[in-house]
Regions:
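Electropositive, beta-rich accessory/interaction domains or terminal extensions
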Residues: 1-97, 101-102, 111, 168-176
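Short, charged, solvent-exposed linker or helix-capping segments at domain edges/interfaces
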Residues: 120-121, 159, 173-175
Length: 176
């Protein structure tokens, strides 16, 4: 079964663990620094503040934390900027526009998180650890996926996640 293992909100650009439920609003996680209809990230606002916000919510698979910890890093859920940590879903292999249903909430996947140098500010070498290359030399981004909230609901740690694939042909996730 796939489920939420941890849930976080960003307040003043910090990520905090919570032990209660949080509301997914139609613009993202209620109270989160990235919540909004248009882009919230400073670099994207500087380029064009009217761009739609395709990064309302960030999900990482718990299996990545395990991989990083086995490689010598000390990473806990929420420390890499994610709002939701999942277990049992291969997030990186989901196609664009996949919908994740958590109770009545619906998240539509928009693309891959493009990791940035802030990861190295947290732990040296972490950015390189979440990047890889496939057998053809193409870059693999392992730092999770981004999405938008289609339908809001209060969600909490332990809630089940149902995956709804879009109609084929499927589009591979690209960085957003």
């Amino acid at each position: 079964m796939s489920e939420i293992t941890y849930f976080f909100e960003a307040i003043q650009r910090l990520k905090l663990i919570f032990s209660r439920s949080y509301k997914l609003a139609r613009l993202g996680v209620e109270g989160d620094a990235h919540c909004g209809k248009t882009v919230q990230h400073r670099s994207r606002v500087a380029k064009d503040p009217t761009q739609p916000n395709l990064r309302q919510i960030h999900l990482i698979h718990a299996e990545l934390h395990e991989e990083l910890n086995n490689a010598g890093f000390n990473v806990s859920p929420g420390q890499m900027g994610e709002n939701i940590t999942t277990k049992g879903i291969d997030l990186l292999k989901l196609p664009t526009d996949t919908r994740l249903h958590i109770k009545e909430a619906t998240i539509q996947i928009t693309g891959l998180r493009n990791p940035c140098a802030q990861l190295d500010n947290f732990q040296s070498g972490l950015m390189a650890a979440v990047l890889d290359k496939d057998k053809n030399g193409r870059l693999i981004r392992k730092a999770g996926i981004m999405g938008i909230v289609i339908a809001g609901e209060v969600v909490k740690t332990g809630d089940s996640i149902c995956v709804e694939l879009p109609n084929p042909p499927y589009r591979l996730l690209e960085k957003v």
